[in-house]
């Protein structure tokens, strides 16, 4: 396992991790995590992929986990797309020939889908979009939606509680419990990232 840094277009340092099998990897899986979580929540996926001879790269999104930036915020949505591009270029430099599979879960799935729509690249052999955040699973109070829209234009870094119902994360109660107790998990979102 190796840790690495990614320098963003606006000067932030994002924290990443590479885990590779002992032999030359069959493929590279690049994981983009969901909103509020971080790369260390994907160790079960990493372990399964390593057992299959697949190298795995992960990173903490800006404002998440151990990466720099205001918690739960991106100054511009386009920065998230640029961050994924830098992340993929890092993985490609590590392994020149292995096919890259780009995976995004939840908000990460949202970012990956937009990356694929906005960027032209021959680097990605396949994509996995797991339970993408296409819209909120609940309807927030109307005043919060109006406030978020106003604040997104005036002060995009304004934050409020995300109101995520952790009991809906998994049918396994221990998953929700671990999420709730994880000090690197966020429970706030900024107006600039509000959908």
Model-assigned labels for residue ranges:
Residues 39, 46-70:
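Conserved alpha/beta-hydrolase
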Residues 1-23:
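N-terminal cap/lid segment of alpha/beta-hydrolase-fold proteins
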Residues 36-38, 65-95, 99:
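Catalytic nucleophile-loop/oxyanion-hole region of alpha/beta-hydrolase
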Residues 26, 53-54, 97-99:
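Short coil/turn segments at beta-strand junctions that form active-site/ligand-binding loops
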Residues 107-192:
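Alpha/beta-hydrolase-fold enzymes
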Residues 26-34:
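Short beta-strand element of the alpha/beta-hydrolase
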């Amino acid at each position: 396992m190796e840790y690495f840094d990614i320098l963003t277009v606006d000067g932030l340092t994002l924290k990443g991790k590479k885990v590779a099998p002992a032999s030359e990897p069959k493929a590279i899986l690049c994981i983009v995590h969901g909103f509020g979580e971080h790369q260390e929540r994907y160790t079960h996926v990493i372990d399964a992929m390593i057992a299959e001879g697949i190298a795995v790269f992960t990173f903490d999104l800006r404002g998440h986990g151990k990466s720099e930036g205001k918690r739960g915020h991106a100054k511009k949505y386009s920065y998230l797309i640029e961050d994924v591009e830098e992340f993929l270029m890092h993985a490609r430099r590590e392994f020149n020939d292995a096919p890259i599979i780009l995976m995004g879960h939840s908000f990460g799935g949202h970012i990956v889908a937009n990356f694929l729509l906005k960027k032209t690249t021959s680097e990605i052999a396949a994509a996995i979009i797991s339970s993408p955040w296409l819209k909120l699973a609940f309807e927030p109070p109307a005043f919060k939606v109006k406030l978020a829209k106003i604040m997104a234009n005036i002060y995009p870094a304004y934050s409020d509680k995300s109101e995520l119902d952790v009991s809906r994360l998994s049918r396994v109660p221990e998953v929700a419990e671990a999420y709730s107790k994880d000090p690197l998990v966020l429970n706030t979102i900024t107006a600039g990232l509000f959908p």
